Amino acid sequence: MSFFRITLHRSAIGLPKRTHGVLAALGLRRRNQTVFHPVEPQFAGMLMKVKELVRVEEVPHRLTKRELKDERKPDAGFVVEKQVRRFIPGVGVQDEVDFSKVVEELKAQKVENVEGVEKMVVEGGAVVRDGKRAGDLGVRTRSDWEVIGKMKSVLPKVKAL
């Protein structure tokens, strides 16, 4: 059995009582409220009376309130639409930077918070230098910064304090 998915798109403020009555009979009180009714002539007639105020779709089954809410919820996480071009001193502009070599070198030197190093390398060849921001990025100690400073040969973009 199919259903009408009816969503009140425009308010009925200032319209005749008859229009308010039709919306009440359909179960619509607030804007963007959605109700489901079976595809029957009586509901089709009501929809014709308020066709300027509602949006109607024919769907195969009713959705629960939870499913309606989940439809409005955005997808979790992030989507990389386009990677930012990066400037590396001595190399020039590159479309992609490979961090695997940097991370391997840091792990070999037993640097803690290796994941933070990937976050440290930012656009334009600059590194966040103040301690508060560095703490947010996961790089905790001055010795970590010194090790990173020694790695200019691996990735010239990473600089020490």
From Swiss-Prot:
CDD domains, alphabetized: Ribosomal_L30
GO MF annotation terms: structural constituent of ribosome
Keywords: Mitochondrion, Ribonucleoprotein, Ribosomal protein
Keyword Ribonucleoprotein annotated: yes
Superkingdom of this protein's organism: Eukaryota
GO terms under biological process: translation
Pfam families: Ribosomal_L30
Primary site of residence: mitochondrion
SUPFAM superfamilies on file: Ribosomal protein L30p/L7e
Coiled coil: none
Entry GO CC: large ribosomal subunit; mitochondrion
Subcellular location: Mitochondrion
Subunit structure: Component of the mitochondrial large ribosomal subunit (mt-LSU). Mature N.crassa 74S mitochondrial ribosomes consist of a small (37S) and a large (54S) subunit. The 37S small subunit contains a 16S ribosomal RNA (16S mt-rRNA) and 32 different proteins. The 54S large subunit contains a 23S rRNA (23S mt-rRNA) and 42 different proteins.
Functional description taken from the UniProt entry: Component of the mitochondrial ribosome (mitoribosome), a dedicated translation machinery responsible for the synthesis of mitochondrial genome-encoded proteins, including at least some of the essential transmembrane subunits of the mitochondrial respiratory chain. The mitoribosomes are attached to the mitochondrial inner membrane and translation products are cotranslationally integrated into the membrane.
PANTHER family recorded: LARGE RIBOSOMAL SUBUNIT PROTEIN UL30M, MITOCHONDRIAL RIBOSOMAL PROTEIN L30
Family: Belongs to the universal ribosomal protein uL30 family.
Official protein name in the record: Large ribosomal subunit protein uL30m
